[in-house]
A protein has these predicted regions:
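C-terminal accessory helical subdomains adjacent to catalytic cores in phosphodiester-
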Residues: 2-153
């Protein structure tokens, strides 16, 4: 799920305020989603359910390295503009602060004909998962959690 695209009645969304830290928003919504699954489906299902709500669009990850993203889509002419966006925020995870200034909207302003599946994948491959993990702490924490899970038989 992408936090800003969630309906207003999504689990815990009504408990989140604009001035909350992004980690607190994430914790609140994931907790309420997990609680809902537990109440509706029971412990046997809930213990296998790992709630995760991405606090930004996929394109937020592309701001992990503006240089690599621009290089990947062969648009080195926009590196400085991408860096300007990135430098306004603590992490790429903070960029998605409204539906009008979401990462994809910012990229579409710079890249005419931006195709999310094509350019997004090319950019992500150029950036690499290690850089995304380093720049996006909530995403990294979730991946670390998944990596530590025992295999189910």
């Amino acid at each position: 799920f992408d936090f800003y695209a969630l309906p207003s009645d999504f689990f815990g969304r009504d408990q989140v305020s604009a001035n909350m830290l992004i980690q607190s928003k994430y914790d609140t919504v994931c907790h309420e989603l997990g609680r809902y699954v537990l109440n509706k489906l029971g412990q046997s299902v809930a213990r296998r359910f790992i709630p995760y709500v991405q606090m930004y669009e996929f394109e937020g990850l592309l701001f992990s390295s503006p240089e690599k993203f621009a290089q990947g889509i062969d648009r080195l002419d926009i590196v400085h503009k991408l860096k300007d966006v990135r430098n306004q925020f603590e992490t790429p995870e903070h960029i998605n602060n409204s539906q009008h200034t979401a990462p994809s909207k910012r990229i579409k302003q710079l890249v005419k004909g931006y195709q999310k599946p094509l350019y997004g994948v090319i950019g992500a491959l150029e950036i690499g998962l290690p850089t995304m993990r380093q720049e996006c702490p909530i995403f990294n924490t979730w991946l670390n959690y998944l990596a530590q899970l025992p295999l189910l038989e």
